[in-house]
Amino acid sequence: MRKIVHLSDVHFGTADPAVTELVVSKINEISPDVVVVSGDLTQRAKSIEFKQARAFLDRLPKPQIVVPGNHDVPLYNVFDRFLRKLDKFEKYITDDLTPTFIDEEIAIVGVNTARSLTIKGGRISEEQTHYIQSQLRNLSDDMLKVVVTHHPFDLPDGHDEDDVVGHAERAIHMIADCGGDVFLAGHLHVSNIETTANRYKLPNGRVALIIQAGTATSARVRGEPHSFNLIQFDNPWLRIERLECRSVADGFRPA
């Protein structure tokens, strides 16, 4: 059985130190094959926050697939926002904005959906979608094929439609056409699992999973406890479990 830990929106700068320690401990206990972080490593894209995020990642198992979120782009420094939007992310976290992991059973491809022209929105470009296709197209149908973005392809009830990643319709059809099985994201600080059938009509009746992680460590929770996802793959079975922390004393337990 293969294990993927999916966490998001750790937001160093507002991260709860006690919960952060619990996350590190639990993920190391799980000993996953891959750790996925779907963006918003910082609160305000400050160097000190990126340094804290780097130290956090260094304590987690490898390999890791890490993509930026909108909070990892400077907000108030307009010069940096437009001309050096991901310089600090690339310096402290990774300079690979299309992180990819492929072995004999799992393929995971991440892309950056954060943009300078929006405060919180994001989009996936045609070029990025073609890159994902190039990585997934010729892989075995028996493999689990995962795409990672910060902005989600679908939403829980009651959320702003603007939070759906831009160009989602085009991208999800192109990716599904080459076998995309699972779409991982964050952004809303709310856990959610949907199938693509909720929003999209894919060709040949194909259905994929859209999975969002809540915030793992940020003090700014939105109606649910700190959490992250554990994805277990034993072909053809896929199990998704949310681990949540209702109190520091309880630690992270299955929801």
Question: Which role fits each region the language model picked out?
Answer:
Residues G13-D16, Q43-I48, N70-R81, S116-K120, ...:
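Active-site environment of divalent metal-dependent phosphoester hydrolases
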Residues D141-P156:
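Short acidic, glycine-rich surface-loop motifs adjacent to enzyme active sites
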Residues Q232-A255:
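A short C-terminal boundary segment appended to hydrolase-like catalytic domains
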Residues M1-R59, L75-Y76, Y131:
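N-terminal active-site segment of His-dependent metallophosphoesterases
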Residues K51-Y131, L139, H173-A176, P203, ...:
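Extended active-site neighborhood of metal-dependent phosphoesterases/phosphodiesterases
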Residues L7-S8, V35-D40, Q64-N70, N112, ...:
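Active-site neighborhood of phospho(di)ester-bond hydrolases with catalytic His/Asp-centered motifs
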Residues D160-P236:
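Conserved beta-sheet core of the metallophosphoesterase superfamily
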Residues M1, P32, P61, S140-L144, ...:
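A general structural motif
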